[in-house]
A protein has these predicted regions:
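Sec-dependent N-terminal signal peptides
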Residues: 4-13
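C-terminal segment of classical bacterial N-terminal signal peptides
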Residues: 13-19
Length: 238
């Protein structure tokens, strides 16, 4: 817990990684980078990345993929490219190996780069992309430990209610600029949109875990954004 408090005070925050079902443990173990982009054609952009794995190999990524915003978009073609690393040092170093604004023309013509961020996880997290509700929230440092613990409790309760593939992560930015600074990113992940909707239906029907969700919400100072993303892994170093 002391590590989490220190991270919060430094405006840092955490990932436990699992590429093809590998798991990376809590604070300090594992990190990832994201590049937020506007794609002219999301399918063509993803196809290009999938066909050019050397882009991810060159920066030492353990795994990589994409998330396409399907609801709550700020702009058309909103998506991100993510890549995972064994530690934050490797993630930071990767930023020196590739400049997204100096990409080959074949790639540059497919998208406009918005910004990049490095992330750390505050709780264990299984990298198993799917249909993901993504909340960006602001939480006071004095409430951070309680908030993370509430999410752990909520994740366990939803899994035990019959959603065995459900997964939650809470992450904080390094180098978030005006876009992400002092903001936590929470991901609630289900295999499909239907199952995600079923979980929401169960909440409104009085699910036993409802009070835990409400407890976590009470610890949030502000919800910055609320989107749904369709995510997939397109590269693995193994």
């Amino acid at each position: 817990m002391k590590k989490i408090i220190l991270l919060a005070c430094l405006l840092l925050t955490p990932l436990y990684l699992k590429a093809d079902h590998h798991t990376i443990a809590g604070p300090g173990e594992g990190a990832f980078n994201t590049i937020m982009v506007q794609a002219n054609d999301t399918a063509k952009y993803v196809d290009y990345l999938r066909a050019n794995p050397e882009l991810f190999k060159a920066v030492g990524a353990m795994a990589a993929g994409v998330c396409i915003t399907r609801s709550g978009n700020d702009y058309e073609g909103q998506m991100l490219v993510w890549s995972t690393y064994p530690d934050l040092a490797s993630a930071m170093h990767a930023n020196t190996l590739y400049d997204p604004n100096d990409a080959p023309s074949a790639l540059a013509n497919l998208r406009t780069v918005k910004y990049g961020v490095s992330w750390k996880g505050l709780k264990s997290f299984r990298l198993d992309p799917g249909w993901e509700r993504v909340l960006r929230v602001k939480v006071s440092p004095e409430n951070l430990n309680a908030y993370v613990e509430a999410l752990r409790e909520l994740e366990t309760a939803i899994i035990n209610s019959g959603h065995e593939s459900f997964n939650m992560g809470v992450f904080g930015p390094f180098g978030g600029g005006v876009h992400e600074t002092q903001t936590l990113m929470v991901r609630a992940i289900s295999p499909t949109a239907r199952e995600s909707g079923q979980i929401a239906d169960e909440y409104f029907a009085g699910a036993s875990w409802g009070p835990i969700w409400e407890k976590s919400r009470a610890l949030i100072d502000k919800v910055v954004s609320d989107t749904y993303e369709l995510c997939e892994q397109i590269y693995s170093a193994e």
